[in-house]
Amino acid sequence: MLALFMTLAIAVQAGATENWQQKFIRFSGVAGETLAIGDVVCIAGADGQVYKADADSSTRRPAVGVIGKGGAAESTVEIVVSGILDGQSALSPGTRLFVSTGAGAFANATTGYDQIIGWVLPGTTDTATSTKYFIMALPPIPSTGATW
């Protein structure tokens, strides 16, 4: 039971573009820092550039998607709003993915800033975990206690 209440920052595994199986909705932006495939990102209001999202920072949220093609600061990067990303940390299918308090990472539990960024998809037959994530950047859950 204790595990249900713990927040886990899921390390993003740097990978090649083949980790993206499908990219349904995507757009490009200018990186404000070095960004890698799988980083959860936001667009900063101060300069309009793309940065790693962070649930603890009011200037680094809300998340708008996940990096599909990364790059160094000042380069053009691809942000995926909806798609299927494989090769990530193994979690139970159906687990909701939230913006983490660790910059650019996923969390598998709410972090105080409750924005769902995706779900863990079913893996191969007869496996209890999956490394395949369905990414769908949703607006943050209102602080009034409303839920999706």
For each feature predicted by the language model, list its residue ranges.
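Glycine-anchored, exposed beta-strand/edge motif detector
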Residues: 11-148
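Bacterial N-terminal signal peptides
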Residues: 1-9
